[in-house]
Amino acid sequence: DGIVAKDGVRAAFDLYYPSSDSVRQALAADFADQMRQIGIEVSPRGASWDDIYPHQYSSPVLWGWGSNSPVELYQLTHSKGWGNYACYDNAEIDAHLDQARAARTVENSYEPYRKAQWDEATQTGVAPQGASTWVWLANIDHLYFQRDGIAIAQQKPHPHGHGWSLVNNVDQWDV
């Protein structure tokens, strides 16, 4: 059937997504199609969040993350992060993240955050060339309507559907 196997174990897993979310359903189906092309069987499983949570540490889930804050990097990849569903535990990465959070200025946090993502010197990090603790599938574009006479300032990328990123710089709008 084209699915690769090693020692009798097929490269196959379930991928959970909230059945109430048609975008995640489509992403799960497309991801499964792409993985099949390289010999991996992904079975999308639509369910309620109550039914998904028991699987959050044992099976992939199509989460909807996204934030312009590095706090999210900490929560998703630090061994003590509440969103570390991959159960990733690396003392070096934890040290970088702890150093970044303890920095006295935002500027001083940049380098340890970068090293947590990828440290060329040690060849470690959570980015795709390293541990790749998350598979980033897509950034969803947001569509906003704008009233004539309002000039909305330059926007940075907007994360997942909550957070009201649109108004982060409302003080720079020209009304």
Stretches found by the model and what they are:
Residues 23-33, 52-175:
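Detector for C-terminal structural segments
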